């Protein structure tokens, strides 16, 4: 009887121990943010951060297939862990295995170039377009989009009062079904980068239509802008995509620290009615993102908003605000902020639509900036000429430009129809404008003594002044 009793106790103890071990094993599993997952692209030839959660205080072993090395770290009391390791040159596929008592594996990892793509609706606009707002030639481009070397990740729209630690999204290979739903601007950017470099490219899109610049910023960066009302509680969030800080918290914060090459940005339409602070605010956003990432002065390329008749969305009885002031503010930023560049879209707007269909133009101009300024491509022009000054000789204004080594051109003619001049009365009149190498000569019979000149400084304009094939931004010499 005693022997039987002891055997029963031993069996009971063994059963309890097995159940405990099984329970611990079930809980002992590394959890990773959504962007650390199968099919991801990791930035090549750099130090990358990996992070996640595991069993509190447990050791975590990370094994990488490209160097067959095992790295060790330890989760803290809350289960959080972080580790930095080196990545090889472009290639793959590779795997990473995580072990804290239970194995977790990321498969089909490619090493290549990783870019973050952010902004509002013109960045968000998918290849399939919006209702009654198609993307030009998208059907053919979608049909031909299959490319296992191009990987896509879209962050789900998330607005939050407090900073989040993860996003919702999955990595997808570029095939017609996935490309159709993906950002058109980002796709055309990534496609050109991948084709020209012939290495894997990953694109992470974090965008929300109608979002304000302030929504993508940390509250500390907005202290210089008292008009930006930072929410003090959930009740203060009156708009999920415009309230300051809410998209930084919900969509950007979880990505901070992810090793990448740089950022492309297409935003500004929501800020057109408060343009006077945009250059300062956008510059603060770029500096803030760079400081948060702690990856140096990474490239930041952005689109200037395209021309559109904002009178269409102006309430009856209210003055129509000229969005050229916002374009002017955007143009200031590339001269203030290092390692940045602006894709001018003055020839790619749509009078009756705020979402122009020329997304290939936008994406590929951003890609040219990256190819030349980041990847060192020679023989290609990536930056538009820009206005540097004017002088008056008799009744003619002589306008000068920089970044115009091949002179200014108007494509199929030698004159521009978008210039105006004004005298001391500050009244602008249409002017005749013709090319003289890298300068423009401008005059109007109605202004015998000009003191100011403007080009394309209207809500909607069809840009007709170029340096090679890149349009000159709208500009003005005055500050009236």
Where are the regions that the model predicts?
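Bacterial Sec-dependent N-terminal signal peptides
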Residues: 1-29
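Cell-envelope and extracellular/periplasmic
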Residues: 29-480
């Amino acid at each position: 009887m005693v022997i039987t009793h002891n055997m029963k106790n031993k069996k009971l103890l063994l059963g309890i121990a097995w159940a405990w071990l099984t329970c611990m094993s079930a809980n002992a599993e590394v959890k990773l943010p959504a962007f650390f997952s199968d099919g991801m692209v990791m930035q090549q030839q750099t130090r990358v951060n990996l992070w996640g959660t595991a069993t509190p205080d447990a050791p975590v072993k990370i094994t990488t297939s490209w160097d067959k090395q095992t790295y060790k770290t330890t989760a803290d009391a809350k289960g959080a862990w972080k580790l930095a390791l080196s990545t090889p040159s472009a290639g793959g596929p590779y795997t990473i295995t995580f072990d804290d008592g239970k194995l977790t594996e990321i498969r089909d990892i490619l090493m290549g170039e990783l870019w973050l793509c952010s902004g509002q609706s013109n960045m968000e606009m998918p290849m399939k377009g919006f209702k009654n707002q198609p993307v030009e030639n998208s059907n053919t481009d979608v049909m031909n989009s299959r490319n296992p070397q191009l990987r896509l990740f879209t962050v789900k729209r998330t607005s939050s009062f407090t900073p989040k630690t993860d996003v919702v999204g999955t990595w997808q290979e570029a095939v017609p079904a996935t490309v159709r739903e993906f950002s058109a601007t980002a796709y055309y950017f990534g496609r050109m980068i991948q084709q020209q470099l012939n290495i894997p490219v990953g694109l992470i899109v974090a965008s929300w239509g109608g979002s304000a610049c302030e929504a993508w910023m940390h509250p500390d960066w907005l202290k210089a802008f008292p008009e930006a009302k930072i929410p003090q509680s959930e009740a203060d969030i009156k708009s999920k995509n415009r309230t300051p800080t809410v998209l930084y918290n919900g969509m950007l914060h979880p990505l901070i620290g992810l090793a990448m090459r740089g950022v492309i940005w297409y935003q500004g339409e929501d800020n057109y009615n408060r343009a006077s602070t945009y250059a300062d605010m956008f510059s603060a956003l770029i500096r803030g993102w760079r400081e948060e990432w702690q990856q140096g002065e990474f490239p930041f390329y952005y689109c200037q908003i395209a021309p559109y008749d904002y009178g269409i969305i102006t309430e009856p009885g209210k003055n129509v605000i000229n969005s050229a002031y916002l374009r002017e503010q955007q143009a200031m930023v590339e001269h203030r902020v290092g390692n940045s560049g602006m894709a001018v879209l003055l020839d790619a707007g749509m009078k009756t639509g705020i979402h122009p269909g020329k997304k290939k133009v936008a994406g590929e101009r951003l890609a040219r900036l990256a190819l030349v300024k980041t990847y060192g491509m020679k023989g290609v022009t990536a930056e538009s000429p820009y206005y540097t000054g004017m002088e008056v000789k008799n009744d003619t204004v002589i306008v000068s430009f920089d970044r115009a080594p091949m002179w200014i051109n108007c494509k199929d003619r030698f004159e521009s129809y978008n210039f105006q001049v004004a005298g001391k009365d500050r009244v602008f009149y249409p002017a005749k404008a013709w090319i003289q190498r890298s300068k423009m000569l401008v005059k109007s019979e109605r202004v015998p003594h000009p003191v100011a000149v403007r080009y394309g400084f209207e809500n909607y304009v069809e840009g007709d002044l170029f340096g090679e094939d890149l349009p000159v931004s709208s500009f003005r010499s005055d500050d009236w």
